[in-house]
Amino acid sequence: MLKMHPNINKYEGVPVTDRIVLAYSGGLDTSVAIGWIGEATGAEVIAVAVDVGQGGESLETVRQRALGCGAVEAYVADARDEFANEYCMPTLKANALYQGHYPLVSAISRPVIVKHLVKAAREFGATTVAHGCTGKGNDQVRFEVGIQTLGPDLKCIAPVRDLALTRDKAIEYAERNNLPIETTKKNPYSIDQNVWGRAVETGYLEDIWNAPTKDIYDYTATPEFPPAPDEAVISFRAGVPVALDGVLLSPLQVIQELNRRAGAQGVGRIDVVEDRLVGIKSREIYEAPGAMTLITAHKHLEDVTIEREQARFKATVSQRWAELVYDGQWFSPLKRSLDVFIDDTQKYVSGDIRVVLHAGVASVNGRRTDTGLYDFNLATYDTGDTFDQSQARGFIELWGLSAKTATTRDERVAASGENA
């Protein structure tokens, strides 16, 4: 019999006959949450673990731990290809960087986890979904808004937030009940990772003057001492990477290989203070070698293939898209509408981009496409160019006519002393 912490309170409104599905990571907090939830509600707990390329332990190891911690069932899903195809690729097409920096590493993994949580709830007859988020972060919103959208009839609970269950209490509970989980406090950071990148926060980093120490990095090598430059050719079809150096690969494989190659060069390190959805600013360290390399290459191919006015408007759409996804609105009507526009812009984003990876930078030095708008004969300054320069004078006169007319008006009003 698991020993209940004396400070734990019962959830109201969750009948003891209910089954509850729990978003399970295999870590301390969610392992302990299995017992906490059972004690607080009397319900059976089904642990749901979703592999989005976070690495580490096998799904079977995670499944066995969940069962060892008291779950009656353990639903595990290898969602790596699904995550790459349906979540990372739309993010790439949008060139999505929240506040110009963050490639939405954690934000885009939550919707796929939500999808499997709701699927598991239906499969096992659960009426409630639980997650291990605190009340201070963005993920609580992402999980609960997503669950409300995909499963409006499902209830949501968050034991760490709702019952004020601290890490010290979690360690005490795990040790007292001999749960099969490591309980040391050796890692002071909060870490979330998947194939699109890695996020590190809290601890020493909360003082925003402190420089990150080398020990917090895992996906990237120190860029100050790089190996020889690594040149890669990334091939795209309709905005999606389909090959690397001429070898056909799936999106997942492209991301994984660029994580390895760009990571070895220290590409993709981001140190930023960002605005959280809950109204506070937070210092975050990100590593996204594959994601940042792909976004860089993709943007350069767009520069060649997308018409100017469409490209300008897409930049605005991409910013709003990133904000929606960061704010937990992956399944919202507006985000779906923006997806339609973004997909339309990608019709001609096909071709090859040559990228040099070196010393923390992914720099583009070559572009090749059959669907581009770059016309050598129009662009060249050499003899034989097809650009008719005689049309420039009239174009300039008309282009500046509005400003010229306004200036003439301003000077006339100023000279007469009239009020505008």
Curated annotation (Swiss-Prot):
Residues that bind ATP, according to the entry? 23-31, 132
Give the Enzyme Commission number: 6.3.4.5
The protein's location, in the record's own words, is: Cytoplasm
Task: Print the keywords alphabetically.
Answer: Amino-acid biosynthesis, Arginine biosynthesis, ATP-binding, Cytoplasm, Ligase, Nucleotide-binding
Q: Name one GO molecular function term.
A: argininosuccinate synthase activity
Q: Report which superkingdom the organism of origin falls in.
A: Bacteria
Pathway linked to the protein: Amino-acid biosynthesis; L-arginine biosynthesis; L-arginine from L-ornithine and carbamoyl phosphate: step 2/3
> Which reactions does this protein catalyse?
L-citrulline + L-aspartate + ATP = 2-(N(omega)-L-arginino)succinate + AMP + diphosphate + H(+)
Does the record's keyword annotation contain Amino-acid biosynthesis? yes
Protein name, please? Argininosuccinate synthase
> Native species of this protein?
Renibacterium salmoninarum (strain ATCC 33209 / DSM 20767 / JCM 11484 / NBRC 15589 / NCIMB 2235)
Gene designation: argG
